[in-house]
């Protein structure tokens, strides 16, 4: 009995140790204080020119007003990774999308020069559509053994809906590894693609007409 007891204790501590070690492999892309490691790009104003504070940080949250189309993008590139981001919608919407569903997005494998929108793979963040793929600017992939693209922009609709109601926090995960990309919404796999034609690049978060908040953006390189 004592032997079983001690074996259980050792097993418990081993599991906890491995979990802590795994958690520590994730590193923050957003530090909760400022936009260090990122720069902004706005369609009307260009790079690192944000006089109307479309992007700001307060109380540990990244606020994106959505008032202008653009994005913040990492200064460095990533190849194989597991990205975790937590977001929720704000209340405000702006032209030309003031009467449409709220829209945002996380693009990865960004390889082209700055523009709206650069060549990349997008994990759609939009009311009712979180987890859709957008293959932007002739990117290709294989989904369910069917070639997707190349066209200007190709949408691949998610297979499951697992979003929380507007105003609540949602957890988005993107796993990109050796040409296979997986989108996870609140712990459920909603979309997968293989043979993605991009394999490395930067990561961006869009501003696209809707007020959006992020409280966590972290990454583990694989």
Feature annotation, model-predicted:
Residues 19-222:
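Carbohydrate-interacting regions of secretory-pathway proteins
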Residues 1-23:
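Bacterial Sec-dependent N-terminal signal peptides
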